[in-house]
Design a protein with these regions (language model features):
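Noncatalytic regulatory segments and standalone regulatory/sensor domains
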Residues: 20-134
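Generic detector of ordered, mature protein regions
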Residues: 3-6, 38-40, 51, 56, ...
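Active-site-adjacent substructure of cysteine-protease-like catalytic cores
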Residues: 1-29, 219
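Charged, long alpha-helical assembly modules
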Residues: 128-219
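Residue-level detector of alpha-helix boundaries and kinks
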Residues: 2, 124-125, 193
Length: 219
């Protein structure tokens, strides 16, 4: 069901199979705007695709759905866990440390890789965050919307303030994507453009360090 121009090998994709009609599965896919159907054989091929980080048929499913879930406790725990992971992981590939690490690496790409390869890598970063969904502005907007709902559920107006700050940070992530796309299209040897991109990333990291540290103290 993927359009031809969106077909490329990526083993980190997730989707929801919510029903079945004969040999077709009813699927909700995050990159497709409407529900779609997928033949059992096609879905099986995708689930057992080869390559790096092969999914090996991995499936998540609920074993028990409580009749009256404690959404307040779950929301608090979710916020705390996200804030902890964004600010406290020791590995410099995730969270705020990961953002700063990317900024440092990106700034060196022209010298290390050459301008042509550096542009390709910037293009890959922008595509990953804007189209594939591994970060960037969209995730910040989504999480800000979640915080707005959490503010109402938990009766904590302060979460509305944090949501506004995170939305503003999402705007800066979108600026990064736009500037990155312009760099790729210009095809000029402009090391200053890479420094500017890195500066936007560091600004986003600083903002998110403050935002998620604040969230840890709130919940």
């Amino acid at each position: 069901y993927f359009p031809t121009d969106m077909r490329f090998h990526f083993n980190g994709h997730n989707l929801v199979a919510y029903g079945r009609q004969g040999e077709d599965y009813l699927v909700s896919d995050p990159v497709i705007e409407t529900a779609v159907t997928c033949l059992a054989g096609d879905l099986r091929r995708a689930r057992f695709a080869k390559g790096p980080f092969a999914p090996r048929g991995l499936v998540y499913y609920p074993e028990h759905v409580p009749a009256d879930p404690d959404l307040k406790a779950a929301t608090r725990d979710a916020i705390h866990q996200t804030a902890k992971r964004m600010t406290g992981l020791p590995i410099p590939f995730f969270g705020v440390r990961g953002i700063r690490s990317l900024a440092t690496r990106l700034e060196r790409w022209p010298e290390k890789l050459g301008t042509e390869q550096a542009r390709k890598w910037v293009s890959s970063v922008v595509r990953m965050q804007e189209e594939i969904g591994t970060g960037g502005a969209g995730f910040r907007f989504m999480y800000a919307a979640f915080l707005q709902e959490a503010a109402e559920l938990l009766k904590m107006p302060v979460l509305e303030e944090v949501a506004r700050d995170l939305t503003a940070t999402g705007d800066r992530w979108r600026d990064f994507a736009v500037q990155g796309a312009q760099l790729v299209k210009n095809k000029r040897d402009d090391s200053e453009a890479y420094a500017k991109l890195a500066a936007v990333l560091r600004e986003c990291a600083d903002r998110e360090q403050e935002i998620f540290t604040r969230l840890k103290s709130i919940v």
